[in-house]
Each structure stands twice: as structure tokens, then as C-alpha cells.
Amino acid sequence: MLKAILFDMDGLIFDTESIYRQSWQFAGAEQGLQITDDTYQQFIGVQDPECERILAEHFQNAIDMTRYRAVRDAHFHQLREQGIGLKTGFDGLFSAIKLRGLTTALVTSSHRPDVLYNFAPFNYLDQFDLIITAEDVQHGKPHPECYQMAYRKLGLKSQQCLVLEDSNSGIKAALAAGCHAVMIPDLLPPQTELMSDITVLDNLAQVIPLLDSYGPKAT
């Protein structure tokens, strides 16, 4: 029986992936380097150090990474100050989860300060039973460590957890951890080899009917 819903954050709860992409591409252009959308897709759901390693390899180390990082982060913060919206269906889904008495966890590759900033305008963060950020793990997605840590800290088994993700890296982490997984794609579609093991939906509102297929209905 389903006991917990484990949420990714960027691109799933918040519409942040597009401004991450703009920031990474802006910082590349500042050094005369073009980061295409196809190149950026490799970074979705992956922690920054690994993304930067891929980027350095892609440009054969012809990039000043210290300068790049500073420009990228400054541009991201500038864009983020304009406001970040919740993704379609999150409000209703979160309410439905709480009505069913299910446990919730936030499991993100982002750092804790970014989590606090994103949730500041909304009354949701303190409603999560567990929060796992980049600071808590040694290995980023697609490694399963974050989701293994989540269900263990919650005192549950992997099969009692449903992971919601927008990225292939996150889905791979969830499946490797032994959890059920639903993908709500944001900037890229699910990889073909994953399709038989997951459910793919258009938005978070569509997750609500699945809750009753895994566990007790709301009363």
C-alpha cells in the first residue's frame, strides 16, 4: 500500500528549469560559447558539479569555469527575482495527498538556500515530513542515494513510495531505489527505455486518481 509521495522540486513543483537554461546559456554566450538546448538537456536533474564537468569536456576545457559560474548564478538570481510560479496542479495534488493522510518528502538536487527561497512565498515547505537537498547526499541523481535516504528516514520500504519527477535522471534514481515512479515531463520527454517502468502524465493534477489506485481513498 502506498504510504508516501516523494517530490522532486525544479521543473516539477516550480517552473524553474527554463530560467536555469537561460542562465547556463547566457553565461556561455558571455564567453563566446554556444550552449544549445540539446547540450543543456544533459544537465536536467543533474547536480551542478557534474554539469560543469560535462560542459568543460564539451568545450575541451576552453571555458573559464570560475567566471562562468559567477555569471550564470548572477543571471539566474536576477531572473528568479521576477517571480517563480507553481506548476499546474500542485495545489490540488498536495491537498489530495494530505486528505489521504499520506506522508510527503521533498527530494531535490538543489541546495537548501534555493529551496527556502523558492518556497518562501508559499505555505508548503513546513508541511513536508522530510526534506532532502544536495547537502545531504554524496551522489546526485541518477544515483538512487537520495530516494534510498528518503524512504529509510521515513521508516518505509521503497515499494511504499511514489516518486514524482520531471527528468530522466530523477526517474532513473527513483527506479534504481526501487520506488514507483511517475514522470511529468518539463523540458524533455521520457527516454524510450524507461517507458515500460513508469507512468507519464501531462501535469500534477493527473496524479490524483493514481493515489486511490495505490491506497485508501480520501474520506
What label would you give each PLM region?
Residues 19, 46-47, 71, 85-89, ...:
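Short beta->alpha linker loops
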Residues 55-94, 100:
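Metal-dependent phosphoesterase signature
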Residues 1-42:
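Active-site neighborhood of HAD-like aspartate-dependent phosphohydrolases
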Residues 21, 25, 48-53, 65, ...:
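An amphipathic alpha-helix signature
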Residues 27-28, 47-61, 118, 151:
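Helix-loop "lid/cap" segments that line or gate small-molecule binding pockets
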Residues 1-3, 95-98, 111-219:
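Asp-based, Mg2+/Mn2+-dependent phosphohydrolase catalytic module
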Residues 33-41, 61-70, 158:
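Short, surface-exposed acidic
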